[in-house]
């Protein structure tokens, strides 16, 4: 089984990736590294002893999402990509809406177009 983890380089995402890899699943990560670091990918691989495929891109990037689904046979998506700072969200509500709602809608559209019906959302 191949799982796409959005926001997979963040704290919750990276820990989830380790568990998925330990369960024998293949993991593809997309993360724009706004609130994380590519170093997390190295740690995921070191802890699990397995490699991951990483795309440094925004979940709103339709072309990259299309390429991921064309390249990998994605069975399930775990969607952790999202902006979450309450104070900043009040200062930048449109940016948060675009990222959190717009990104989720693009992701769901690409999933639908590729026959992927399994998604886990994290608020």
Predicted segments — roles?
Residues 1-123:
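N-terminal Rossmann-like NAD(P)+-binding domain of SDR-like oxidoreductases, especially those catalyzing
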